[in-house]
């Protein structure tokens, strides 16, 4: 047997236990990150609410987020595809609304706080009231989705997968209502004194009175003004405008 061949076999024999230990360690970490665990759900919600109440400038209408099991199930289904391409909006719809989406892929299981921190780090490119850069290398969409005022439900999932032959971990969060409206993306919330828009429904700088409905038309105020909420079109497609008077929408 050639000496090079022998050295290769020795090196491989030494490497196999290391790889086995790494796989076991990764599996152990992954099992602590699955979003079926109530403590993981609460961690994700708490991180988001902490970031939302700390926006600069402060927000007057920022809603407190809660966990949605239905949104989490949609995220779980999509996470199994291990695809960084945005999912079909119909695949992340809830009964009353559509949901936005943030995605991340790693080569090793990392904490949810680390993943959410990656998304939030886009805040360094964001200036309230200014339109986002058109530079393809600069994005603020994941940050603005995190701090979108009217998003009040969140559901997330993580899935192990393989990408080009290597192990990967795919993280997905769905935010409902959906954020990143192209018309208002430069102002994801209303600037002002915390809870100014919800003085009777406030909890630690966050509003607790979401409108559970969603306007599917962008010009619902005009639709309602000219047709009224008794008309079939506004009644079906402008539910937030018609049914929510004091709630945050």
Curated annotation (Swiss-Prot):
One cellular-component annotation, GO: extracellular space
Cited Pfam families: CAP, Crisp
Keyword Nucleus: no
Glycosylation sites: 104, 230
Annotated CDD domains: CAP_CRISP
SMART domains per UniProt: SCP
GO process terms (BP): binding of sperm to zona pellucida; sexual reproduction
Annotated signal peptide: 1-20
Residues covered by the SCP domain: 45-175
InterPro entries documented for this protein: Allrgn_V5/Tpx1_CS (IPR018244), CAP_dom (IPR014044), CAP_sf (IPR035940), Crisp-like_dom (IPR042076), CRISP-related (IPR001283), Cysteine_rich_secretory (IPR013871), SCP_CRISP (IPR034117), ShKT_dom (IPR003582)
SUPFAM superfamilies for this protein: Crisp domain-like, PR-1-like
Signal keyword on record: yes
UniProt keyword terms in alphabetical order: Disulfide bond, Glycoprotein, Signal
Domain ShKT: start-end pairs: 211-244
Cystine bridges: 195-202, 198-207, 211-244, 220-238, 229-242
Distribution of this protein across tissues and organs: Expressed in all the regions of the epididymis except the caput and is not detected in the testis, prostate, seminal vesicle, and brain.
The protein's role, per its UniProt record: May have a role in sperm-egg fusion and maturation.
Family listed: Belongs to the CRISP family.
Name this protein carries in UniProt: Cysteine-rich secretory protein 1
Name of the gene: CRISP1
């Amino acid at each position: 047997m050639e000496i090079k061949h022998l050295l290769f076999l020795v090196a491989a024999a030494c490497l196999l236990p290391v790889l086995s230990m790494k796989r076991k360690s990764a599996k152990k970490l992954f099992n602590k990150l699955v979003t079926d665990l109530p403590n993981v759900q609460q961690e994700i919600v708490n991180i988001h609410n902490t970031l939302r109440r700390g926006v600069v400038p402060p927000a007057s209408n920022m809603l407190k987020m809660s966990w949605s099991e239905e949104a989490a199930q949609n995220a779980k289904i999509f996470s199994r595809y291990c695809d960084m391409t945005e999912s079909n909006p119909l695949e992340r719809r809830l009964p009353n609304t559509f949901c936005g989406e943030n995605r991340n892929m790693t080569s090793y299981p990392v904490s949810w706080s680390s993943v959410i921190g990656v998304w939030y780090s886009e805040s360094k490119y964001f200036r309230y009231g200014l339109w986002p850069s058109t530079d393809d290398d600069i994005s603020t969409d994941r940050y603005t989705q995190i701090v979108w005022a009217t998003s009040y439900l969140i559901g997330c999932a993580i899935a192990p997968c393989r990408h080009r032959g290597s192990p990967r971990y795919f993280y997905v969060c769905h935010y409902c209502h959906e954020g990143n409206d192209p018309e208002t993306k430069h102002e994801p919330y209303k600037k002002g004194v915390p809870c100014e828009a919800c003085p009777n429904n406030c909890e630690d700088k966050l509003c607790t009175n979401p409108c559970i409905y969603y306007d599917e038309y962008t010009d619902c105020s005009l639709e309602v003004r000219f047709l009224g909420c008794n008309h079939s079109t506004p009644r079906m497609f402008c539910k937030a405008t018609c049914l929510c008077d004091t709630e945050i929408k």
